[in-house]
Amino acid sequence: MIKIKKGLNLPIAGRPEQAVYDGPAITEVALLGEEYAGMRPSMKVKEGDAVKKGQVLFEDKKNPGVVFTAPASGKIAAIHRGEKRVLQSVVIAVEGNDEIEFERYAPEALANLSGEEVRRNLIQSGLWTALRTRPFSKIPAVDAEPFAIFVNAMDTNPLAADPTVIIKEAAEDFKRGLLVLSRLTERKIHVCKAAGADVPSENAANIETHEFGGPHPAGLSGTHIHFIEPVGANKTVWTINYQDVITIGRLFATGRLNTERVIALGGSQVNKPRLLRTVLGAKVSQITAGELVDTDNRVISGSVLNGAITQGAHDYLGRYHNQISVIEEGRSKELFGWVAPQPDKYSITRTTLGHFLKNKLFKFNTAVNGGDRAMVPIGTYERVMPLDILPTLLLRDLIVGDTDSAQALGCLELDEEDLALCSFVCPGKYEYGPLLRKVLETIEKEG
């Protein structure tokens, strides 16, 4: 077992009950274009078109052959675009059960599939988009080969679902999905799980299981990659989430694209935090209807540390998100708040009484408690960064855009989620995720 000591388990109220309930009926789903780094769509549908589940909606011009398919049947209700015509979302009004059928295989045939058969079925169904590269966190080219594939079967994000609960319901599909991935490449398939977690595996020669323990970010793929198979400019691995492995197993067994998602609905503003069964790209406001405390709330697709605000054209469950988090908007200001003992506020430093209340869960809000200021290196980054890098120096380089130094310090190993805790504890109120993405784009473009 690999056990990390540095990190932070956020003591946030509203942890979900680890039992799966059926979610509300969903009448709108969408694909969010801005989730896919560097993607430039070539649209295959227009508003008003009828589509089947599994039908191609658009293709990536920059990554030919990579297609994005409909998560449900219905009609194209809207195609939202932002500045410079950036694709924001393709919205489908759900109607009927029409679907496209893909190749299916008998269970005993899965172990003999060729890599080309696996690749073709994943690409045609749109499940190729479940894979992401590291470095750069982009969808791999259809003819690319990884050094390894990392299956993330754990989650240490605040308010997250316990993957073992979800995998237990679909253990055979998960095992079939692992077997399919083992046929995609001859390289290692690293299945990463929490210490002592009951996660099934397959006996394929290239599948290895690893256990991780410790606080968040022990459950992030970036942490797993760093300790098992570090990447660099000339070494790429792929990552995939456990729920997508289940979906792949179902696709190859049935020939049908199953877009079911089990998500955690949690946070201090949720009346009954629990796990809900819904669909990929579901309209978030329909999921949360009647579920929230009647105040000014911020609804987030994903983790409170690194999720996306859901509103307007973005009011949909993200492709790579397994949770919806809800916290209160922090719009009020406090007079001389820094003088008060503040037992109801959490701080990683010893600046509030709440820091010393070890077993208390706090009702967090969106207030940042101060304005923008200079980056202050007081050791907080080092306390939450378990990777063997120099976080203060790296974060400084991200701020000034020094790509050469950032690359030398290990930025190619990282994704936005890997720096979310650094943003949370930053006295200067910097958001390091967008800064990292900007530097990665520059490195990819200019070298």
Swiss-Prot record:
The keyword Transport applies. One of its GO terms (biological process) is sodium ion transport. The gene is nqrA. One of its GO terms (molecular function) is oxidoreductase activity, acting on NAD(P)H, quinone or similar compound as acceptor. It catalyses: a ubiquinone + n Na(+)(in) + NADH + H(+) = a ubiquinol + n Na(+)(out) + NAD(+). It is an enzyme of class 7 (translocase). Belongs to the NqrA family. Disulfide bonds: none annotated. Pfam families: NQRA_2nd, NQRA_N, NQRA_SLBB. Composed of six subunits; NqrA, NqrB, NqrC, NqrD, NqrE and NqrF. The keyword NAD applies. Signal peptide: none annotated. The lineage of its organism: Bacteria, Pseudomonadati, Pseudomonadota, Betaproteobacteria, Neisseriales. NQR complex catalyzes the reduction of ubiquinone-1 to ubiquinol by two successive reactions, coupled with the transport of Na(+) ions from the cytoplasm to the periplasm. NqrA to NqrE are probably involved in the second step, the conversion of ubisemiquinone to ubiquinol. This is Na(+)-translocating NADH-quinone reductase subunit A. PANTHER family: NA(+)-TRANSLOCATING NADH-QUINONE REDUCTASE SUBUNIT A. It comes from the Bacteria. Keywords: Ion transport, NAD, Sodium, Sodium transport, Translocase, Transport, Ubiquinone. Its EC number is 7.2.1.1.
